Regions:
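Hydrophobic residues at beta-strand termini and immediately following loops
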Residues: 105
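Extended active-site and interfacial segments that coordinate phosphate-rich ligands
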Residues: 76-78
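A cross-family acyltransferase "interaction/gating" segment
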Residues: 4, 8, 12, 80, ...
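Membrane-anchoring hydrophobic helices of lipid-metabolizing enzymes
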Residues: 1-56, 61-72, 94-101, 119-121
């Protein structure tokens, strides 16, 4: 069972996939959907950080595009590993995320052995200085407001700071993300109208919805009826 959990969680980071394929694809996609802007709290946020620093980016979760947007704006400085939910455990998304260094988590799975394995992995990569991006809300906001925080994953990450040597190397960086319009706007409106409950859908249904979305927008591009979703703004620090 432990081996099965590890196979599910642990990624296989490929530096060429991240910096060549990842950069090219993210740049192409974002140029279609958004004009991306980034602002730093200080001019050179990475200057002065020790080489063995442990950096955790703490972000609000507005859209599933958050993963791509933040990774893109940081790509010139650092690779970033995310905890990705079960929604992406479908081919080819699972393979892509794992090759980019992200690990998978089951958000509502209460089995103690699974959580022991997950905690051990998260603390291992934290001790070894893997830069991580996390969402304290634990899921996508439905109405744009910040959701109540969930501490499980962050308890695992920050738990290693009990060691004074590691605590001295750890830096938590806040990241604010906002959009003029999110990609999931129609889906989120339907969920709010239905009382805020997110309906459970099969992977086949999810695949159909994604395929339909891609083909619909491709048609708009080909017929020159496409308009961007506006600006995606990121504030770091």
């Amino acid at each position: 069972r432990v081996r099965g959990y590890l196979d599910e969680i642990v990624p296989f980071f490929n530096i060429l996939a991240y910096y060549r394929l990842g950069y090219s694809v993210s740049r192409a996609l974002l140029s279609v959907f958004y004009k991306v802007s980034v602002e730093y709290a200080r001019p050179d946020p990475f200057r002065g950080l020790p080489r063995d620093s442990i950096v955790v980016y703490l972000m609000n979760h507005r859209s599933n595009a958050d993963y791509v947007v933040v990774a893109f704006v940081l790509m010139g400085d650092v690779s970033i590993s995310y905890a990705v939910g079960e929604w992406a455990r479908a081919f080819p998304l699972e393979y892509i995320f794992k090759s980019f260094g992200s690990y998978f988590i089951r958000r509502r799975y209460r089995e103690p052995l699974y959580h022991a394995v997950l905690r051990a992995y998260v603390q291992l990569i934290t001790r070894n200085g893997v830069t991580q991006g996390t969402f304290p809300e634990g899921g996508l906001t439905r109405d744009g407001k910040l959701r109540p925080g969930k501490i499980g994953l962050h308890d695992s990450i920050l738990g290693v700071a009990a060691d004074p040597e590691i605590r001295a190397r750890m830096f938590v960086v806040p990241v604010g993300i906002n959009y003029d319009r999110v990609l999931e706007d129609r889906t989120l409106v339907r969920e709010l109208e239905s009382g805020g409950d997110k309906p459970r859908t099969s992977r086949l249904t999810q695949a159909r919805e994604v395929t339909s979305y891609v083909f619909w927008n491709t048609g708009r591009l080909l017929t020159r009826r496409w308009k961007r979703y506006g600006r995606a703004a990121v504030t770091i620090g």
